[in-house]
Design a protein with these regions (language model features):
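Loop-helix junctions at membrane interfaces
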Residues: 1-172
């Protein structure tokens, strides 16, 4: 019972830490996109949430950290969509990595799974912005979101190597 309680507390602490890192990385560099959103580096940490946390904790850490960044940055209209989109990205990263790492090495698996998660992000924001601004207009943000996705994959893959060297983030 004592070990199980310690693991639960440890998992919550790691999720909270990654959630804070997602928020900071998202707010650190903000480049405005054509339709009221902004490009950021948070996707790299969102992917780490999936790769190093369980699906539930990854979803919550990625979703809460990203949504909080949108709220603090003045993009409140994006908060609900961001919570879901970034949370689902972490779930895709978690389950996808579990499947892919059985068939290939760590870094290629992370890159492949990152591509799938980022495609979902681009599609998620396209649909959300389509309802807000019109689907033809929301196409304007697709290239910007794709660039953000590529940057997120590169950052996430690089940071995953650093995180693997520490024993702090053992797969939960």
């Amino acid at each position: 019972m004592h070990v199980q309680h310690n693991n639960r507390v440890r998992n919550m602490v790691m999720a909270a830490l990654l959630s804070a890192l997602v928020c900071i990385a998202t707010m650190l560099i903000k480049i405005p996109s054509p339709l009221k959103g902004y490009l950021n580096l948070g996707d790299g940490i969102v992917l780490l949430c999936g790769w190093f946390l369980s699906p539930l904790y990854g979803f919550l850490a990625a979703g809460i950290g990203s949504a909080l960044a949108d709220l603090l940055a003045g993009y409140a209209v994006y908060v609900p969509a961001t919570f879901v989109i970034k949370g689902v990205m972490a779930i895709i990263a978690c389950y996808g990595f579990r499947l892919a790492c059985n068939r290939m090495r760590n870094v290629p698996a992370r890159i492949l799974v990152g591509i799938v998660a980022e495609i979902m992000m681009v599609l998620g924001y396209y649909v959300f912005e389509g309802f807000l601004y019109g689907f033809a207009e929301s196409l304007v943000n697709v290239p910007a979101n794709a660039v953000q996705g590529v940057a997120g994959i590169i950052l996430g893959a690089a940071l995953s190597k650093v995180f693997q060297k520490t024993n702090l983030f053992i797969k939960i």
